[in-house]
C-alpha cells in the first residue's frame, strides 16, 4: 500500500478523497485533523484515523477495506455511512447527528462508541462490543452473524430489532429498547446480568432463540 497523508484541514465545500492505498489521518486529534462544512466522501484501501479527528457538518460516506479508528473520532452532524471489511474502533467514537448505516465484515468496538442521533442500521459479520456502547435516539436494526456484548450496551430509545446467529450478552451486558424489542438468535447467552444488565424492553418484546441460557 502507498501511504498518503492528507494536507487538507478545514474545507468550506464538499470534500472527496479517493486513494487505492492507505489514507492516513492518524494522531490529529490535538492538531486539527480533517473537517468539512459540506459533505465528506472518502474511499480508500485503508483509512487510518487512529487517534485522529475527522468530522463533517453534512453527510459523510466512508468506504474502506480497513478502517482504523482506535481512540479516534469520526463524526457527522448529519448522516454517517460506513462500508468496511474490517473496522477497528476500540476506545474510538463514531457519531452521526442523524442516521448511521454500517455495512461490511467485522467491527471491533471494545470500549468504543457507536452513536446515532436518529436511526441506526448495521449489517455485519461480527460485532465485538465488549464494554462498548451502541446507542440510537431513534430505531435500531442490527443484522449480524455474531454479536458479543459482554459488559456492553446496546440501547435504542425507540424500537430495536436484533438478528444474529450467536448473541453473547453476559457479564452485565445490556440490550434495551424504549419501544418494541424484536430479538432473534440461534443461541442467546444472557448470563450474570447483575443489577444493570439483561434484555429489557419498555414496549412489546418478541424473543425467538433456539438455545437460551439466562443463568445468574
Regions found by a protein language model. Name each.
Residues 1-216:
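A composition-driven surface/loop motif
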